Amino acid sequence: MQGILGVFGAAGRSRFAATIAVVLVMCGMFAAAASPANAQASRADRLAQYRAWMVEAKAMYPYPQTIDKMYRVMMCESSGNPNAVGPQGLYLGLFQYHRGTWGGRWNPYRTNNIYDAKSQIFATAKAWSIGMQSHWSCYYITAGR
């Protein structure tokens, strides 16, 4: 009895072994990409991007609070998760917008996806620039300006 690979001959077995080796290497690469260390790096990169967008948004929509204050509110509201869904599914995204608030005429980003992180950051800067800080309970429980 030759075994299942015996029917391929030496050349076929060699190609099969090479294919398996490539698959195993690729699986290892994907496993490395999904490792906790890489997940932490990508989270850190994402949070750094959010802070950079906050700088841009504040330049476009000046408000009196610091960028650190906006960052703290975001972390309080969603822990930096753009796909966060609050209790009972009423509040969504980085800054936990209610769909009714998000769709308000004040919001130039209202036609964008409510889960879009950049849109939420810019909408929040716009909201703060027109005095809507009271819409976030985390605004009052995070320290500093």
Labelled PLM ranges:
Residues 1-47:
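N-terminal prepro-regions of secreted/extracellular proteins
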Residues 28, 35-80:
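Export/targeting segments at the very N-terminus of extracytoplasmic proteins
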Residues 78-85, 131-136:
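Secretory-pathway/luminal and periplasmic proteins that interact with or process carbohydrate-rich
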Residues 89-107:
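Substrate-binding/active-site groove segments that recognize
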Residues 49-52, 65-72, 92-97, 119-127:
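Extracytoplasmic/secreted proteins, especially bacterial periplasmic and envelope-associated proteins
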Residues 140-145:
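Catalytic cores of secreted/periplasmic lytic hydrolases that degrade extracellular macromolecules
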Residues 110-119:
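A short, structured beta-strand-centered segment in the mid-to-C-terminal lobe
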